[in-house]
Regions:
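A short, N-terminal "cap"/entry segment at the start of jelly-roll beta-barrel domains
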Residues: 1-29, 42, 111-119
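Conserved short histidine dyad/triad with adjacent acidic residue
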Residues: 29-48
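Short hydrophobic/aromatic-rich beta-strand segments that constitute the beta-sheet cores
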Residues: 30, 42, 62-64, 98
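Short acidic-glycine-tyrosine-enriched beta hairpin
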Residues: 65-84
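Glycine- and acidic-residue-biased ligand/ion/polar-headgroup-sensing regions
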Residues: 48-61, 65
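Double-stranded beta-helix
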Residues: 7-13, 86-119
């Protein structure tokens, strides 16, 4: 793989905010997630995808397995495959950075506020 500086970021609208993919290779993906106030992502798990994230701005309500806590900027966490999880921005916009394995298709939704099903 060669080094590049394209300046191209893929912005993907989501019902809860948006994602910006800044790196996509066969080994990893880098994203910025912006969750708007009062919104949350699906209660979900990944069969193969492994992700590490850090809160950049805002206060994130983080559910990992059966535990839920609120975390702020500078908090980093890792989500192993098969871990049930959810992110929520109850009091204001939240910005996260995520680096993961490349299986972006690997989403099993267990509950979704926006009516999305399955993958």
């Amino acid at each position: 793989m060669k080094s590049t500086m394209t300046g191209i970021v893929e912005r993907i609208p989501k019902p809860w905010g948006h994602e910006m993919i800044f790196a996509r290779t066969n080994k990893y993906v880098g994203k910025i997630l912006v969750i708007e106030k009062g919104h949350r992502l699906s209660l979900q798990l990944h069969r193969r995808k492994h992700e590490s994230l850090m809160v950049l701005r805002g206060r994130l309500k983080l559910q990992l397995g059966k535990k839920t806590k609120t975390v702020g900027p500078g908090t980093a966490f890792t989500i192993a495959p098969k871990t049930i999880h959810r992110f929520e921005a109850p009091k204001g916009r939240v910005t996260l950075i995520e680096v993961s394995t490349p299986e972006l298709w690997d989403v099993v939704r267990l509950q979704d506020d926006y009516g999305r099903r399955g993958k």
